[in-house]
Amino acid sequence: CYIQNCLRV
């Protein structure tokens, strides 16, 4: 993931 809050790929 490329987001600040991501719990997946």
UniProtKB/Swiss-Prot annotation:
**Site label Important residue for antagonist activity on V1aR/AVPR1A (a Gly in this position produces agonist activity), positions:** V9
Cellular compartment(s): Secreted
GO cellular component terms attached to this protein's record: extracellular region
Q: Which UniProt keywords apply?
A: Amidation, Disulfide bond, G-protein coupled receptor impairing toxin, Secreted, Toxin
Q: In which tissues is it expressed?
A: Expressed by the venom duct.
Instruction: List residues, modification Valine amide.
Output: V9
Q: Which GO terms describe its molecular function?
A: toxin activity
Give each disulfide bond as a residue pair. Answer: C1-C6
Additional note from the record: Negative results: does not show binding with vasopressin V1b and V2 receptors (up to 10 uM). Shows a weak agonist activity on V1bR/AVPR1B (9% at 10 uM).
Write out the similarity annotation.
Belongs to the vasopressin/oxytocin family.
Provide the domain comment: The cysteine framework is C-C.
User: Which protein is depicted?
Assistant: Conopressin-T
